[in-house]
Amino acid sequence: MFLRSSASRLLHGQIPCVLTRSVHSVAIVGAPFSRGQKKLGVEYGPAAIREAGLLKRLSRLGCHLKDFGDLSFTNVPQDDPYNNLVVYPRSVGLANQELAEVVSRAVSGGYSCVTMGGDHSLAIGTIIGHARHRPDLCVIWVDAHADINTPLTTVSGNIHGQPLSFLIKELQDKVPQLPGFSWIKPCLSPPNIVYIGLRDVEPPEHFILKNYDIQYFSMREIDRLGIQKVMEQTFDRLIGKRQRPIHLSFDIDAFDPKLAPATGTPVVGGLTYREGVYITEEIHNTGLLSALDLVEVNPHLATSEEEAKATARLAVDVIASSFGQTREGGHIVYDHLPTPSSPHESENEECVRI
């Protein structure tokens, strides 16, 4: 399609017609970290998402990008389990401390920060780093799992199933301090969190959700209410009439495994493509998205190259739809419409291709 730009000179002097974009300043942070759990391969998630075309997609949407690259986390050679169960606590603590500094820098610079994991233990660092400059933030946690076990209730010992327990102020009398975690300052309260997509919640986690009045929408609620009503209630709970930053923490296993097979803890009966993208489209429409985690893409767990690529492409769609990509196509936003050219300007006519 072509637009005649010469006509705009009649409306705006000699300034050519400009098709302005809805500009977001977006920081990209790769976090190739896997020690929040025991399966190899999730550290290759950032590379897979990059190879699936994330930066090009965001650029086409008009985003101004600052790429921090893929971080290199400090190795912790001696990292014994806590309580003979919780694995790699020092590695997780130090990696999140380093990640929090980068996210904090990005947010303080005016960027919406996209962090590509890596496992979901990284949300400790991204949320703390975000909260340093946006202390009134709220969290939308899209996941098959609640990730709110404590080190004393976990069965697996994996910290990627515990990150929120370290962040919620009201839980701190139930959470022991792990080695490497002394720097952590809890920054969330239950009214500031909403879960979407839950379908594998352990008994202690269910106890926490109920007794601390944390809002959640399981897949059963999504089936019953529909995703539109779920998002309306989410925004009513978190935002209401306030304008506050949103931190979206999105685990790719929120989707049904048929869509996202390359992940470490798949659970049947997950979000459809349409439901998942509707969530991010609606968050974008608020204009309040300030940080986004996309985690748990694990190319090594795919049974074929196509499965790995499909999961990474889905991750790109989640991120892109959070920054303006719609299922109608990514739109360039007009600041005005052109009018027919004057006869004497026709020979200088310029066309802009969209």
UniProtKB/Swiss-Prot annotation:
Task: Give the family from UniProt.
Answer: Belongs to the arginase family.
Q: Which PROSITE patterns match?
A: ARGINASE_1, ARGINASE_2
Q: Where's it mainly located?
A: mitochondrion
Function, in words: May play a role in the regulation of extra-urea cycle arginine metabolism and also in down-regulation of nitric oxide synthesis. Extrahepatic arginase functions to regulate L-arginine bioavailability to nitric oxid synthase (NOS). Arginine metabolism is a critical regulator of innate and adaptive immune responses. Seems to be involved in negative regulation of the survival capacity of activated CD4(+) and CD8(+) T cells. May suppress inflammation-related signaling in asthmatic airway epithelium.
Assigned keywords, A-Z: Adaptive immunity, Arginine metabolism, Hydrolase, Immunity, Innate immunity, Manganese, Metal-binding, Mitochondrion, Transit peptide, Urea cycle
What is this enzyme's EC? 3.5.3.1
Q: Which Gene3D superfamilies match?
A: Ureohydrolase domain (3.40.800.10)
What is the protein named? Arginase-2, mitochondrial
Quote the CDD domains the UniProt record gives: Arginase
Annotated membrane-spanning segments are none
Listed binding positions for Mn(2+) 1 are H120, D143, D147, D251
- UniProt-annotated binding residues for Mn(2+) 2: D143, H145, D251, D253
What GO biological process terms are annotated to this protein in UniProt? adaptive immune response; arginine metabolic process; innate immune response; negative regulation of activated CD8-positive, alpha-beta T cell apoptotic process; negative regulation of CD4-positive, alpha-beta T cell proliferation; negative regulation of chemokine (C-C motif) ligand 4 production; negative regulation of chemokine (C-C motif) ligand 5 production; negative regulation of defense response to bacterium
Keyword presence, Thylakoid: no
Quote the record's binding site residues for substrate.
H145, A146, D147, I148, N149, S156, G157, N158, E202, T265, E296
Q: What class of enzyme is it?
A: hydrolase
Q: Which GO terms describe its molecular function?
A: arginase activity; metal ion binding
Cofactor(s) this protein cannot do without: Mn(2+)
